[in-house]
């Protein structure tokens, strides 16, 4: 899923659990992808490309069991929950951030082709809805999700505009008929990983900064137990 749309999940988390520091929420919704970028840049996880890249289905997430397997995400979420709920005595924070971490793999399962493993060491079967096999449909679904998160949050018009523009900016990646910079990625998966890293930063900054005046804090609601 486009990085901006993963980032908008933080809007939903903040709406449900307003007492959790938004910086933690923003990092949590992209924790899986941040790890993917690092592991790809170090060659621990593997991405391959077709000789010619015209759209996202010409890029293959061939090996990513540590960042994007279902079991790994469960472990990440559990660790986050233990750290905040048990060690820091913040059970509400722990729950919210565990949900934020888990949201990433749920959204990827809803969009990816079959490239998400069950666990490290288990290469088959792999999971994914197959939506990326129809890239333009995936584009529409992803944008609808991002706008829906904005609508639930009741964000500003500026935030909506940025969500829409960042989605439209990636449109060529979803259609081989629309020219774009995708051809530069052929044979260069590390450039792709770095580009995703940039997209993550841009998406998180956009959501974090443009919604900052509306972020709910624990002061906006009666204080929850353990918060």
What kind of feature is each model-predicted range?
Residues 1-227:
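N-terminal membrane-targeting hydrophobic helices
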């Amino acid at each position: 899923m486009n990085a901006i749309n993963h980032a908008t999940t933080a809007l939903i988390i903040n709406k449900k659990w307003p007492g959790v520091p938004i910086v933690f929420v923003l990092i949590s919704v992209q924790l899986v992808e941040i790890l993917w970028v690092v592991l790809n840049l170090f060659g621990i996880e593997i991405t391959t490309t077709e000789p010619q890249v015209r759209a996202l289905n010409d890029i293959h997430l061939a090996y990513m069991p540590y960042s994007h397997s279902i079991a790994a995400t469960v472990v990440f979420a559990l660790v986050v929950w233990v750290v905040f709920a048990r060690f820091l005595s913040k059970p509400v924070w722990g729950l919210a951030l565990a949900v934020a971490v888990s949201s990433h793999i749920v959204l990827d399962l809803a969009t990816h082709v079959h490239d998400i493993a069950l666990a490290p060491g288990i290469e088959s079967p792999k999971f994914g809805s197959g939506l990326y096999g129809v890239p333009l449909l995936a584009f529409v679904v992803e944008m609808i999700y991002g706008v829906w998160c904005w609508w639930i949050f009741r964000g500003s018009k500026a935030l909506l505009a940025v969500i829409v523009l960042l989605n439209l900016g990636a449109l060529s990646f979803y259609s081989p008929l629309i020219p774009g910079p995708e051809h530069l990625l052929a044979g260069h998966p590390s450039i792709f990983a770095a580009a995703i890293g940039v997209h993550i930063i841009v998406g998180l900054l956009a959501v974090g900064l443009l919604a900052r005046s509306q972020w709910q804090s624990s002061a906006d609601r009666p204080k929850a137990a353990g918060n």
